[in-house]
UniProtKB/Swiss-Prot annotation:
First and last residues of every WD repeat: 26-65, 91-132, 175-213, 224-264, 283-321, 338-379, 414-447
Listed GO biological process terms: cell division; exit from mitosis; mitotic cell cycle; myoblast fusion; regulation of chromosome segregation
Subunit note: PP2A consists of a common heterodimeric core enzyme, composed of a 36 kDa catalytic subunit (subunit C) and a 65 kDa constant regulatory subunit (PR65 or subunit A), that associates with a variety of regulatory subunits.
Gene name as annotated: ppp2r2d
Protein name stated in the entry: Serine/threonine-protein phosphatase 2A 55 kDa regulatory subunit B delta isoform
Keyword Acetylation among record annotations: no
GO cellular component, one term: protein phosphatase type 2A complex
Functional description taken from the UniProt entry: Substrate-recognition subunit of protein phosphatase 2A (PP2A) that plays a key role in cell cycle by controlling mitosis entry and exit. The activity of PP2A complexes containing PPP2R2D (PR55-delta) fluctuate during the cell cycle: the activity is high in interphase and low in mitosis.
Localisation: Cytoplasm
Major site of localization recorded for this protein: cytoplasm
Length: 447
């Protein structure tokens, strides 16, 4: 990858936008997670209404040579329904918190989806043939009159219109007391972990009635609680290693070979705080909202409220790279605290070669950082630049003084428009960005 934009780097252009244009967006239609599968041919989104929509990539052809960044609806299904916990008198939302794909082993695709309490394994498969000529049933499924059956028929498979079916294969429930914030498929592709505020469980994909509790930070007295688990992920190559982040801005790396209960970490990553910059908001903005291993497994990336940090797994005392996402908001923390925006959980993602990273911001802005050149760019997901192949213009935020023509004032940013969820194609420069109820797909400009 050459870079993320600006100078001699390639530039990004609009490919598609999915979703309605309505000003009044229904809460159920807000996208809550975005995830490419391992090949990048499928793209899944989950929303607050418990639905999963899967998009399939359009194949390039001679007639449409530039359609590589185009995805069309492949399957839509209701993954979770709202429930009620009668023991605790609590409503359980249907909102999809996370989707994780499993590597494809055969013609079918499998993914895990979770709401606050229940994880489901879904099988997505295609059918283009159907059996006809049953002896005891008509073509529409009704039982035939036994007296009318005069000959033995051999059922045959006949072609039919392609149908994509989504069926739940496993339901993993009743293992989390608190809200699930993360699921991560292990590199053995047989197990996965799920994390809530205080515990992390290890599951086998074939076994639904039990899981192993591998982390438990719940104190004997809940009044002594000082931090919660905010995210967790398995190492991409070592199936015994995983990390989890906390609301105190720390990351713990654990090795399951050391003990069955990984309460004692193998490595502890924390950046010392500068006492001169300490404020009332310091602990809130240091809370980590996302942690992602690089594809190589050498680095991991964490996202807090104002920055993205890249850590070398061999160096625990400080990150090797720090990127400021929206430092201009530091002076606005008081008002962001009052409107609860300071608690927004932004995610982050790597490109396929680990040379660039992407994360979201407010005003439907999203940021990219090139790790090699240290260049960065701010782009906007907007319908105003949604003409096919339209180039995305870099955006700049002005913090004070005279504002240039192409700059936007920090005071005019719309904090209701926020990009929390982004995904980068695992092999190419195609990105998916969720902006409220719309899914934007962009690709690099091909010369």
């Amino acid at each position: 990858m050459a870079g993320v934009g600006g100078g001699n780097d390639f530039q990004w252009c609009f490919s598609q936008v999915k979703g309605a244009i309505d000003e009044d967006v229904a809460e159920a239609d807000i996208i809550s997670t975005v995830e490419f599968n391992y090949s990048g041919e499928l793209l899944a989104t989950g929303d607050k209404g418990g639905r999963v929509v899967i998009f399939q990539r359009e194949q390039e052809s001679k007639n449409r040579p530039l359609s590589r960044g185009e995805y069309n609806v492949y399957s839509t299904f209701q993954s979770h329904e709202p429930e009620f916990d009668y023991l605790k008198s609590l409503e359980i939302e249907e909102k999809i918190n996370k989707i994780r794909w499993l590597p494809q082993q055969n013609a079918a695709h499998f993914l895990l989806s979770t709401n606050d309490k229940t994880i489901k394994l879904w099988k997505i498969s295609e059918r283009d043939k159907r059996a006809e000529g049953y002896n005891l049933k008509d073509e529409d499924g009704r039982l035939r009159d036994p007296f009318r059956i005069t000959s033995l028929r051999v059922p045959v498979l006949m072609p039919m219109d392609l149908m994509v079916e989504a069926s739940p294969r496993r339901i993993f429930a009743n293992a989390h007391t608190y809200h699930i914030n993360s699921i991560s498929v292990n590199s053995d592709y047989e197990t996965y972990l799920s994390a809530d505020d205080l515990r992390i469980n290890l599951w086998h994909l074939e076994i639904t009635d039990r899981s192993f509790n591998i982390v438990d930070i719940k104190p004997a007295n809940m009044e002594e609680l000082t931090e919660v688990i905010t995210a967790a992920e398995c190492h991409p190559h070592q199936c015994n290693v995983f990390v989890y982040s906390s609301s105190k801005g720390t990351i713990r790396l654990c090795d399951m070979r050391a003990a069955a209960l990984c309460d004692r970490h193998s490595k502890f990553f924390e950046e010392p705080e500068d006492p001169s910059s300490r404020s009332f908001f310091s602990e809130i903005i240091s809370s980590i909202s996302d942690v992602k291993f690089s594809h190589s497994g050498r680095y991991m990336m964490t996202r807090d409220y104002l920055s993205v940090k890249v850590w070398d797994l061999n160096m625990e005392n400080r990150p090797v790279e720090t990127y400021q996402v929206h430092e201009y908001l530091r002076s606005k923390l008081c008002s962001l605290y009052e409107n609860d925006c300071i608690f927004d959980k932004f995610e982050c993602c790597w490109n396929g070669s680990d040379s660039a990273i992407m994360t979201g911001s407010y005003n439907n802005f999203f940021r990219m950082f090139d790790r090699n050149t240290r260049r960065d760019i701010t782009l906007e997901a907007s319908r105003e630049s949604s003409k096919p192949r339209a180039m995305l213009k870099p955006r700049k935020v002005c913090t004070g003084g005279k504002r240039k023509k192409d700059e936007i004032s920090v005071d005019s940013l719309d904090f209701n428009k926020k990009i929390l969820h982004t995904a980068w194609h695992p092999k190419e420069n195609v990105i998916a960005v969720a902006a409220t109820n719309n899914l934007y797909i962009f690709q690099d400009k091909m010369n």
